[in-house]
């Protein structure tokens, strides 16, 4: 039988993450966010990179951009220093996600981006970190605490990162005038595709 403590921990997780999203609005920087939206709306290509949980959410961000026809791909930090950064060209944008802002695997990619004329957007909690200092745009990843009792698992921090990426996509949709009809063409599958293509919006 599942313990009362286990159920209590599960319920507390909802409260912790809901509180985090509410608090994040206090850290929303209109100027920095607007710069990020402008870059993402005009860049020929978008790269994303992160390690661990941040890397997984960066894969999600690349897909979010592709879903509104902003060409994007996740660039594995392991592959980035073995030629994968050839995807990036002058005028492109690279998004780095690192809660601490010091992820060593990402730092060589920064140097490549700088040399190639690629703009950098960094999402981090540490605004004084190397990745933040190297960026053209920095977005604050506020985290109240992780949901596990040790405050160590990548839980609330991934929710915070997702929230920022979701907000960016919503803004880019508005900025570029992307239409439901365009999305319907590239998303014919599933319930979403059926709804869009039947124009039951």
Where are these regions (language model features)?
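Internal, active-site/partner-interface "lid" segment
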Residues: 133, 147, 173-201
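Glycine-rich phosphate-binding loops that contact phosphosugars or nucleotide phosphates
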Residues: 45-51, 55-176
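Conserved active-site and cofactor/substrate-binding residues in soluble primary-metabolism enzymes
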Residues: 12, 16, 28-31, 35, ...
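Alpha-helix boundary/capping residues
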Residues: 40-43, 95, 190
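An N-terminal, well-structured beta->alpha segment
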Residues: 2-42
């Amino acid at each position: 039988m599942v313990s009362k403590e286990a159920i209590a921990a599960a319920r507390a997780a909802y409260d912790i993450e809901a509180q985090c999203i509410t608090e994040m609005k206090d850290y929303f920087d209109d100027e920095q966010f607007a710069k990020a939206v402008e870059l993402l709306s005009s860049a020929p290509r978008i790269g994303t990179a992160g390690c661990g949980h941040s890397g997984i959410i960066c894969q999600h961000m690349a897909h979010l951009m592709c879903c509104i026809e902003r060409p994007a791909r996740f660039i594995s930090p392991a592959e980035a220093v073995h030629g994968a950064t050839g995807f990036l060209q002058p005028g492109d944008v690279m998004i780095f996600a690192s809660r601490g802002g010091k992820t060593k695997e990402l730092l060589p990619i920064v140097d490549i981006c700088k040399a190639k004329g690629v703009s950098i957007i960094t999402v981090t909690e540490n605004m004084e970190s190397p990745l933040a200092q190297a960026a053209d745009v920095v977005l604050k990843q506020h985290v109240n605490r992780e949901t596990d009792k040790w405050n160590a698992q990548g839980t609330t921090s991934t929710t915070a990162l997702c929230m920022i990426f979701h907000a960016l996509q919503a803004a880019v949709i508005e900025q570029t005038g992307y239409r439901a009809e365009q999305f319907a063409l590239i998303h014919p599958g599933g319930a979403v595709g059926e709804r869009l293509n039947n124009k039951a919006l």
